[in-house]
Amino acid sequence: MELKRKSILLIMAFLIGCDLCACGKEDSVVGESLVEDTEEVSSTEETKSAEEEAAEQWEKGYDLPVDEQEREEAETDCKKLMELYLDIYETADKGIASNVVLDDQTVLEMQKKVKDAGYPIATMVTYSNMENYESVDSFLKECMEGKSGSAVIYEVHNDGGLGRMKFIFDGTDMYVVSTIGIWNADNNPGISYISYTRLKEWKYTDKGWFCYELCVPEPPEVSEIVDGSCVIRIKPMTEEQCEMSERCVRGLGYQGQNLLCSNWNVENMSELDYNGMFEYLYGMKYGEKFNSEDYPNGIPKEEFESLIMEYLPITAEQIREYAVFDEENQTYLWARLGCFNYAPTFFGTSLPEVVDIKENQDGTVTLTVEAVCDMVICDDAVITHELTVRFAEDGSFQYLGNEILNDGIMHIPDYQYRIKD
């Protein structure tokens, strides 16, 4: 009986032990299952989060991931083309400054090397034309018809580096893979920058300007406005248009004086800003920047009037009447542009470009000029105006009048005189 009782107790203990083992094993399986489920959920959430971030970035349109093949192609092409003008870069006068700035002639020589290899190539030299532009022109015209495709534009920078822009159109959106090639201290080409960005909007004008706005960070992501506007001249200007632009309007521009952004003629010259225009005419005549430190007490009467009369059909008496003149010291006042006398405008940064030249029966020449603005408004003709000039046999010329067409003066900021009576 005692033995039976012991047997029963042993059996009961065994069963209880088995039950406890089974429970422990079941708890272990459940625990492992919960861990696996949690890891799967976490992994799914991370994947979902990464996908959402990628989708969000694509929606923003900037800092897009660059395909490895595109990256390799861009880097290889940049370095290969820079090697074409290595000999020019090595012997070029780079000055002593840490930031290399090459002269225009050297940059144009580099452009010719790339041109001869058959690539579309532009420069940052003002009024220079893109060489081998035809393929880009065709690409943009096809894009306007909704046809997908791609085109690459190269640009020689003023430091001798090379920009590469591959524009890709998928039938709906335009993208650009931008790459910048630079020279290192050993004159070896390298890559400093590469990006992939969507164009927010774009247009190709009849005049041949490719105007576009890149997607960029916007408030509240950034505290300041980032300007993504760009303009690239595709179709070339004629040689005469380039020459007249350089000779007659580049030195003036649209800020600091109002020769090109007001209506006037030989019968109505009282509204011109003579005190403002002096420094620009000085730069045109002498080929160097006006140094105000040489004139601490104002500009001497004879020097001021002589320069103005060289470029305008006006008398010394009229200048003294229209300009701000110091009778006591016999000098004309001058003030540097600053926050107290000038509010910067996008229009003021525009580049004047001669688009047509007409010889008149009276021997004068009428230049049709358009203001090209590459900032924010991104417009290849903010205003169109006709500038009348008379050329002398010795190569000198005088401005005779300016007329802004199509009520364009209503669409630009009022002019600010830097010095007021």
Residue spans for each PLM region:
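Hydrophobic helical h-region of N-terminal Sec-dependent signal peptides
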Residues: 10-16
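C-terminal motif of bacterial Sec signal peptides marking the signal peptidase cleavage site
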Residues: 18-22
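Bacterial N-terminal signal peptides that target proteins for export
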Residues: 1-10
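Mature, Sec-exported extracytoplasmic domains of Gram-positive
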Residues: 29-421
